[in-house]
C-alpha cells in the first residue's frame, strides 16, 4: 500500500473466524532439531503476540490444515503467514514440522510426503552445523531459522498476503526475484488466489494489483523522499513508509512508531483485490480499515479510458476528460460508461505553437518513459522536441543513493491511461495541447 493513496470506504469486507486447532496443549519459543512440531503444540513469540502452528480456516465441512502464523489474541482474520498454501494437510495427527538432516525445515506426513520445506539446501545455504540450528518466532511475527548466529531463512522473505511493520518488501530484481503478495482464494481457503500485489518488473517506482495478468489497480508513481509519513487520527500515530536499498536491491517497508499500536497494524492483499491498511480495535474487538484501495469503480485501472481521469476531489467520484479533451461518446459518458475515453478538442500543430497545460494534484498516467539524470529544462525540451510526446512530469527526488538519480523525468508517447486527480496529494502533469487552448 502506497502512502499517497487516499483513504476511502470499503466495498467488500472480508471477515471470517479461524478455527484454530483446539488441541494446543504446549507452547515454546523455538523449534529445535529432534523436537518436531505436531498438532497440539505451537511456537509462541516472547511477548505472546504471535503463534505458529497448525490451523484450519474452515469452520464446517471437510477441514484442511496448514502451518501458519497468527495473532494469538485476536479471534478473527488473524492469520498473517501460511507455509503450505498449495499443499494442505488433511489429517493433522499424521503431519509434523521438523528439521531435516540438513539445515531445512520440512512439513511432511507419516507417508513421507513432503508438503512444504524451507529449501535452504537447494539454495546452497546449508550449514554443516545444522544440528545446532533453531527456528524462533519473534515479537514482530518473523519466524527465523538460524545456525551459529547466521540467518539461513526467515518468513519475512516469503510473504503470503500480508505485510507486517518492519518487513522489507523487495521491489527490484537485480539478484533476487521480485516479492509479491498473493491473495487467498477465498476467506476459508488460503491457497493462492486471483489477485497479486507487487512492483512493475521494469519500474520499481510504481506498484500494481493484478487480477491474473490484467492490471486491476496501480499505485501513484513514487515522487518523493525516502521516508514518507501520514498521520492517522484514529490510531493517534503516524504510519511511515520507507524506500531503501539492502544488498543492491530496493525495498519498501512501513512502520508505526507507537509501540502500543505497531504490533496490531498490517497491510493486506485481500481476496476481493483490495490493498488494505488495517488495525485491530480492541475496544470493539474488530478490525478497522484505515485505507482500502480501490474504493470507487473509477479507481480501477484504466476505468476512464484514454485521456480520461478519475476525479477523487468531488462529492461524487467520477470520470472526467483531461483539460483540452472531450468524450469520444457523449451518450456513453452521460450513461457513466467511460471506457472509450476522450479525444482532443483541437489537433496538435507540432512546431507551430503547441503548449502544455498544467493539471495539479494528479496521479500521473501509466506507460511512461522514465528518462534519468535530466534537469527540468531538459525534461521539457525532450517532450517539446518530440511531436509524439503527449505529456511530461518532473520531480526532484531523494533517490540518488538508490539509483544514482535525484531527479525523475517522465515522458508519455501516445495515449494517457489510468490517470486520477487526488485529494491534496499528487503532482503536476503537463499535457500537450494546441497552442490556441493554452
Question: What role is predicted for each listed range?
Answer:
Residues 2-438:
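Beta-rich ligand-binding surfaces for carbohydrates and other polyanions
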